[in-house]
C-alpha cells in the first residue's frame, strides 16, 4: 500500500498562502500526524497540514503539550511528509527547543530534514530575534500568539488572551514585532474577535484563527476535535464536523468548504 498522492492540485507554498490572503481566499488548516490522514486531508483540499504538539494531548494522552519532544515532532513530520501532500507541511517546535536563536535553528533544521516546509513557535516580541535568525537562514516561520498552550502554567490555565485593554495592546505589539522580524504566517488562538480582526487588518501576512473569529485569513482546528474525538468538555471554538456525515473524508470536506465559504467559525465558536 502506498500513500503517495497523484494530484493535479498545485502545491501550496509559503508565497501561495500570501497570494491567497491577498486575494481574499480563506486558508484551511488542520493538524495531521500520519501518512494516511495526510493523504485524506490533502484529497479534501486542506491547504496546510500542521504537525502540532497537540499530539501530546490527542495521541499520547498528556494533559498539556509540554512533554512532547523534538523527536516526537520529527517522527510524525516524517510520517506526514511521506504521503507527499500538495498541502504545505508545518511542524511545531516543542516546548524548550527554541530558548536561543541557535537552538531554534538547529532544531528547525531537524524538522525540515524530516519534511517540514515551515516551523511554528509560540511567542511574541521576545521571539523577534529568533524569528529573524531563522528567516535569514531560509527557515520559514509561523508565529503563534494569544493562548499559547506551552505557556499554560504561566497563564494559570487555558484562558482567552487579549481581553483587557492592556492585553489587547500587547497582542498588537507582538503581532507587529513578529511580522517585522520576518514571520510569514501567524496563528491567533483564543483571542476576542474584535482584537483578532484588528490584528488581521493591521498585518500584511496571513492570520490563522482558532477561537479568534471569522475575520482571520484562515482557520485551524485539531483534527481529533473537528471529528468529535475528544475527552471531556469540548472547547467553545470547536465544531464537530462528523455530525451528519457518512465518513471522515466527508467531514473533512465539510470543514474545508465551511472555512472557504466563511460559514465557519460562527459567533458561537468565537469570543
From Swiss-Prot:
CDD domains, per database record: KPHMT-like
Catalytically driven reaction(s): 3-methyl-2-oxobutanoate + (6R)-5,10-methylene-5,6,7,8-tetrahydrofolate + H2O = 2-dehydropantoate + (6S)-5,6,7,8-tetrahydrofolate
Active-site annotation: 189
Keywords associated with the record: Cytoplasm, Magnesium, Metal-binding, Pantothenate biosynthesis, Transferase
Disulfide cysteine pairs (residue numbers): none
Residues bound to Mg(2+): 53, 92, 122
Residues annotated to bind 3-methyl-2-oxobutanoate: 53-54, 92, 120
Record protein name field: 3-methyl-2-oxobutanoate hydroxymethyltransferase
Species for this entry: Burkholderia multivorans (strain ATCC 17616 / 249)
Upper classification of the organism: Bacteria, Pseudomonadati, Pseudomonadota, Betaproteobacteria, Burkholderiales
